[in-house]
Amino acid sequence: DVTFVKQNETAIDAFTFGDKQLSGFWYGKFEIGGTLASSCTNETCNVSNIVVKPNVSSLRSQKVSSFFYAARSMEQTGNSFGFVSSEVDTHMSKNNEWGAVAYLTQSIYGRCTNSTTCTEVGINNNTSYITGIGDKPSSTASSVKTNTYNTISEKNASTTGNIYGIYDMSGGAWDYVMGVYKKTISDSGFRSLPDIKYYNNYTESSYTGHAISETKGWYNDQSFSVYFSVSPWFIRGCFYDDGELSGVFAFYGSSGINGNNRASRFVITNE
C-alpha cells in the first residue's frame, strides 16, 4: 500500500473530489482511443467504441466538452464497460489529477531510485498517435510502431519505468485536462461549465500544487501561460513532434477547440 500523506495531514487537492476525501483514483493507463459516432453534447452519448488500451490511435479532434461528456457517458446505464454509476464516477482528467501522477514520477514509486536520482519519462513519438509507443525523451518523430508498451524501449515512456506505469504522458497528443482560467468557456463547446468538482478553476497567474508553477521548466519541458482569454484551457504533455520539450511537466494553453493533435484521458473514482 502507498500512503501519500501523514496521519492528520491534508492531502494535495487531487484527492479531494467534491466534498469527499479519496484514498486514491484510477488514472487512464493510456490516452483515450477508439472513435465517436459524433461529438458528445451530454452525458448519455454513444461511447461503445471508446477504449483505453495500447496500440490504437488516440481519440482526437474533439472539443473539451466532447471529451468531458464522453468520459461522463462511460458510466451511463447499460454502458459497455460494466461500470455501475452508484459505485464509480467516470470523468475527464482534471489538471490536478494529472499533476498528482506527474509528482509520482519524481518519487521512488516512479522514476527515482533515491531522493536525488531520477530519470525522465520517455516520449511517445509516433506520428500516427498510436497509444503506448515510446522512445528516449529527446527522440524525434517516427512512424515506427514496434516500440510498443511492453518492449524495453517503450518502458522508457512509462511513468514508473516498467510495464505497470502510465503511458502517453509525454508526447503522443497534447492532452486536454479540465483546468481553465477564470471559468472562460471560449471554444470549449460548453454552454455552461459542469459541477466545480469536475474542473480546476484558476484566478491567478501562478499556482502551486498542480505541477505547474513549481515544476515549470523541469527537464526543459515546454511551458506557456494559459492565463489569457484566447487560451484559457490547459493542455499537458506536448505531442509527438516536440522532442525534448515534451514531458509530464509540460503545459500550454488552448481555446478548447477540436485540434487534430488534442487528445484526453479519463479517471475513475469511487462514488
Give each language-model segment a name:
Residues N96-G99, T131-N147, S153, T160-I163, ...:
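C-terminal, surface-exposed recognition/capping segments
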